[in-house]
Curated annotation (Swiss-Prot):
UniProt comment concerning the protein's domains: Consists of 3 domains; the N-terminus binds the ribosome, the middle domain has PPIase activity, while the C-terminus has intrinsic chaperone activity on its own.
Main subcellular location: cytoplasm
Molecular function as annotated in GO: peptidyl-prolyl cis-trans isomerase activity; protein folding chaperone; ribosome binding
Protein name from the UniProt record: Trigger factor
Domain of life: Bacteria
Keyword Ribonucleoprotein: no
Residue segments, region Disordered: 436-513
Source species: Novosphingobium aromaticivorans (strain ATCC 700278 / DSM 12444 / CCUG 56034 / CIP 105152 / NBRC 16084 / F199)
Residues annotated as domain PPIase FKBP-type: 164-249
GO terms classed as biological process: 'de novo' cotranslational protein folding; cell division; chaperone-mediated protein folding; protein transport; protein unfolding
GO annotation, cellular component aspect: cytoplasm
Length: 513
């Protein structure tokens, strides 16, 4: 086999590889000898079919298989002999006019990973913004649960409904005098002042009594999900069947026992733990972004364009999906299109950070254990139907690239934790609002990719936390979804989705989307 380098520019490499016809033919002959004992043909005893007949029957298929195997081996040799670290799968093309009996002339094009030295971790300093959980916040959390457990009892006869009361109603909605689908319901509980129905609905029912029949007029919002009701004026015929007063909520041991706990103190302890876990997640997000900003500021090496393009395509696809869910998809698409160059630079930053974190992890022995990997696979399999889970597990175990993409986020977190341990960390107590503002500021600064302009405040900033793969030479960057600047934690979804519209009762505000 002959290998000739034809391009060596920056991170681009190209080669011509010549595989002698004799090598391919020898592999074909070897395969014929392997399968001959299993070939059956009328007129011949089992295993006694002549090689020339086996070749005639199976030759083309065996040649194609031998050619593909030889090409794979040639690629392995090319990578090993030249100590290459491909950024992505090399592009391999077989010369035109190739036929059996001829030498195979291959053209190979690829991009390699840059040579990166793991940076010194001396002098790495980080500030940890800590939000203490106050007793008032715990009490508020208890009160919120109490609101959800609110009980109602019948009001005195003839009592008029007021804000905070619950009324039981039948209603029939009409547009232009005609009832519309989903606009009628019976025995519907409605808490006045809760804001669960469309604007103007609840307000007109303050003061009603049991037995009252009333017709109210409302206007559906312009962003109402049902196209036939958007902006339309409608009337609702209301029959009041009950008026109920809310019971007084009291935070005590009895209330905690209603929730299956032993005491109010136990409830508060659980809620405090939840609040502390939530703020700890925000603190980690702030520290991680500050860390990545420091790393990005100190490194500006070239990265493979193919990796940047793959990362950008993932970001772009997610942004387009988000835009389609906006109130005005066309306007949202125009907005992201105007900022396309910014997002491409964000993709470049993410790839660069991913390679850098990978190098740091490998240089310092950071690993994802087999037990951790097994847990990852099992957790990921849960998103599939039960009958498909084992197939997914088998696929990940047999496909190195699939396993690498699954492992990458955990590996990145382990590298980040390693850097946290190495850094000189100073703590400062702040309020939740101050912590959130710090996250927003870091996210906005990260989105400013030189020499691009700073991203607008309402721009959806792509996630800056780049991948950090365990074997960068063999793995693509993690394809993490972009997210809005308003997202609080780097583990958060790309966009908070509004609840789906309820078809049952269009009058409810929840159905507004």
């Amino acid at each position: 086999m002959q290998i000739v380098e034809t391009t060596n520019e920056g991170l681009k490499r190209a080669y011509t590889v010549t595989i002698p016809a004799a090598d391919i033919a020898a592999r074909v002959e070897g395969e014929i000898k392997k399968i001959a004992p299993q070939v059956r043909m009328p007129g011949f005893r089992p295993g006694k079919v002549p090689a020339n007949l086996v070749r005639k029957m199976h030759g083309p298929a065996l040649h194609q298989e031998a050619l593909q195997t030889t090409i794979r081996e040639a690629m392995d040799k090319l990578v090993a002999d030249n100590k290459l670290r491909p950024a992505m799968q090399p592009a391999v093309s077989l010369g035109e006019g190739y036929d059996e009996g001829k030498d195979a002339e291959l053209t190979v094009e690829l991009e390699v990973l840059p040579q990166i030295e793991a940076p010194s971790l001396d002098g790495l300093k980080l500030e940890k913004l800590v939000v203490p959980v106050t007793e008032a916040e715990v009490d508020e959390a208890v009160a919120r649960i109490g609101q959800g457990q609110k009980s109602f009892t019948d009001a005195k006869k003839g009592a008029k409904a007021k804000d905070g009361d619950q009324i039981i109603i039948d209603f029939l909605g009409k547009v232009d005098g005609v009832a519309f689908e989903g606009g009628a319901a019976e025995d519907t509980p409605l808490e006045l002042g809760a804001g669960r129905f469309i604007p103007g609905f609840e307000e007109q029912l303050v003061g009603v009594k049991v037995g009252d029949e009333k017709t109210i007029t409302v206007t559906f919002p312009e962003d109402y999900p049902a196209e036939n009701l958007k902006g339309k004026e409608a009337t609702f015929d209301i029959t009041v069947k009950a008026v109920k007063n809310a019971g007084e909520f009291e935070a005590n041991d009895e209330f905690a026992k209603m929730l299956g706990l032993e005491s109010l103190e136990q409830l508060k302890t659980l809620l405090r733990g939840q609040l502390e876990q939530e703020t700890a997640g925000l603190t980690r997000t702030q520290m991680k972004r500050a860390l990545l900003d420091q790393l990005a500021a100190g490194h500006d090496f070239a990265v493979p364009p193919s990796m940047v393009e793959a990362e950008f395509e993932q970001i772009w696809a997610q942004l387009q999906q988000e835009a389609q869910r906006e109130e005005n998809p066309e306007e949202a698409l125009k907005e992201i299109e105007a900022e396309k160059d910014d997002y491409r630079k964000i993709a470049e930053r993410r790839v660069r950070l991913g390679l850098l974190l990978s190098e740091i992890g490998q240089a310092n022995g950071v690993q994802v254990t087999s037990q951790e990997m097994e847990m990852l696979i099992r957790q990921a399999a849960q998103q599939y139907r039960e009958q498909d889970r084992q197939r997914f597990v088998d696929y990940v175990r047999s496909e190195p690239l699939a396993a690498a993409q699954l492992r990458a986020p955990l590996y990145e977190d382990k590298v980040v934790d390693f850097l946290f341990d190495k850094a000189e960390v100073t703590e400062r107590e702040v309020t939740r609002e101050e912590l959130q503002a710090a996250i927003e500021a870091e996210e906005g600064a990260a989105a400013e990719a030189k020499p691009a302009k700073k991203a607008p405040a309402k721009k959806k900033a792509a996630k800056e936390e780049a991948p950090a793969e365990e074997a960068a030479a063999e793995e693509k960057p993690k394809k993490a979804a972009p997210k809005k600047k308003a997202a609080a934690a780097d583990e958060a979804p790309a966009a908070e989705e509004a609840p789906a519209a309820k078809k049952k009762a269009p009058a409810k505000k929840k159905a507004e989307g």
